[in-house]
Amino acid sequence: MAASFSVTRRFFDDKNYPRGFSRHGDYTIKESQVLEQYGQAFKALDLGEREPATKEEKDFVAFCRGERAAETFFEKTWNKYRTRINTKKRVYTLSSDVSEAASGGEDYSGE
């Protein structure tokens, strides 16, 4: 697999993971390393900016197009990444009204 997914630089997603993949907690150590090391190739193949050169890359492109399910560790990791960045994150609070809680609490009378 040395020739497959060759890249010249590491992959960082500062928009979704400003502190890095390993510090965010969504990925295992191995998944973080794979995303950083091969993420540029994954992204280019997924967006069609790069032509697949090997059988592994051709299979990866077929997975990205939805022609087959994720089977390899690389495909499962990229699928997890795409799912995480495209899913809206929910934030839960203990307050009934977030704007009221942020304004300092108008229920307090101070008497």
Swiss-Prot record:
Gene disruption phenotype: Disruption of the gene causes a slight decrease in transformation efficiency.
InterPro entries: DUF413
Highest rank taxon of the organism: Bacteria
Pfam families in UniProt: DUF413 (PF04219)
Record family assignment: Belongs to the MaoP family.
Function according to Swiss-Prot or TrEMBL: Involved in the organization of the Ori region of the chromosome into a macrodomain (MD). It constrains DNA mobility in the Ori macrodomain and limits long-distance DNA interactions with other chromosomal regions.
Name of this protein: Macrodomain Ori protein
Species, as recorded: Haemophilus influenzae (strain ATCC 51907 / DSM 11121 / KW20 / Rd)
